[in-house]
Amino acid sequence: MKKFSELKVGDEYQSTCTFSKKEVEAYLAFSRIKNTIFDDDEYSSIVSGRAIISRMEGEFTRLSQIYGNMILLYGMDGDPKWENRNTRFLKPLHVDEILKIKYTISDKKDQDDEFGMITV
């Protein structure tokens, strides 16, 4: 675990994960967000973008550098400092494909010696 003072703007961390069919179904049941397109056999193996984002947030909290810190996740899309852009994916992710995730610390604000806020 890194202390807040050790995290630097520009630090990059990577993780990988996959989604099983069972995990996708569990997420959709929990979130109650399901696009009817996923009922079509042609699209049923595609992982929902919201499920991917949820997993990315979870994977971030499990990084050895982050694990053990108090994490409060808030906001994601439409940040004025990010020119109000929204999260987009380059291509669909299918069940059992490997998702490669790269996190980059793009901003850091100190609150005091121990606490602060990072933008990833």
Q: Where are the predicted features?
A:
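Hot-dog-fold acyl-thioester-processing enzymes
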Residues: 1-84
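Hydrophobic beta-sheet segments that form the core/acyl-binding groove
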Residues: 80-120
